Amino acid sequence: MTKSFAKELAPFNIRVNALLPGLTDTKFAAFLTQSPEIMKAVLPTIPMGRIAKPEEMAGAVLYLVSDAASYTTGACLNVDGGMLA
């Protein structure tokens, strides 16, 4: 969907990108992050060995909406500590 919308809207100088977040320390994910059993299973699958902080997701979004990404459209940015690498 991201790529389709990016192609359709690019002529209007509208950029469409997606953020693909990894496990992030939020209230929404607390049932996962506060479970020692789950964290014991999940952390080894993340090459960086930790979960993300919300501000790390915010930084990625700030990049995507900034002028530094003015020629970026149709991108799916993985911010997952290398989990999908």
Task: Report residues per predicted region.
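Short, small/polar-rich loop/turn modules that mediate ligand/substrate recognition or access, typified
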Residues: A10-R15, T72-G74
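Short, glycine/acidic-enriched loop or turn micro-motifs at the edges of active sites
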Residues: D25, G81-M83
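Short, flexible catalytic-loop segment of classical short-chain dehydrogenase/reductase
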Residues: L20-F31
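A short hydrophobic alpha-helix cap/turn motif
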Residues: L9-P11, T24, A52, V65
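C-terminal helical subdomain
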Residues: A18, K40-A68, T72, G81
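Hydrophobic alpha-helix immediately C-terminal to the catalytic Tyr-X-X-X-Lys motif of short-chain
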Residues: M1-F5, L9, L19, L64
